Amino acid sequence: MTDLGPLHYFLGIEITSLPDGYRLSQQRYTLDLLARSGLTDTRTAATSMELHLQLRASDGTPLPDPSRYRHLVGSLVYLAVTRPDISHAVHILSQFVSAPTSVHYAHLLRVLRYLRGTPSRSLFYSRRSSLQL
C-alpha cells in the first residue's frame, strides 16, 4: 500500500483541510451538472423550492421523454450528499421520477437555478467538535 498524501478529491467530493477543520464540497460537480443541463447563463433562484409547495402526480402534462428528468434528479440525489440545503426539494422531486410532468420539470429547473447562484456551498466539519450524535 502506498501513501498518496493528504486527501483532496474522492468520488467527486473535494476535501479541503483547514486549520480548524475540513470542508467538503462538490462545486466542480455542481458546475459540471449545470453545464450538462445548459443552465450556465440563466438567472438564479433565491431558494431551492417555493414555500408550502404541494406537488401532485396529476399536475401538468406528462413529459414525452422522462429520461432527462430522471437523470437530473439522480444527479441531484448525489449532490445532496454535501448539499443538505437541497435535500428536501430533491426528496419531493424524486417522488415523480416514474411519471414526471411539465410542472415537476419546472420545479427541477428551479433547483438547478438555485444551485447556479450557490455553487460553492459546502459542509464544514470542525476539528474541535465531537462527531457523536
What is each of the regions a protein language model found here?
Residues 1-133:
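Long, low-complexity, charge-biased intrinsically disordered regions
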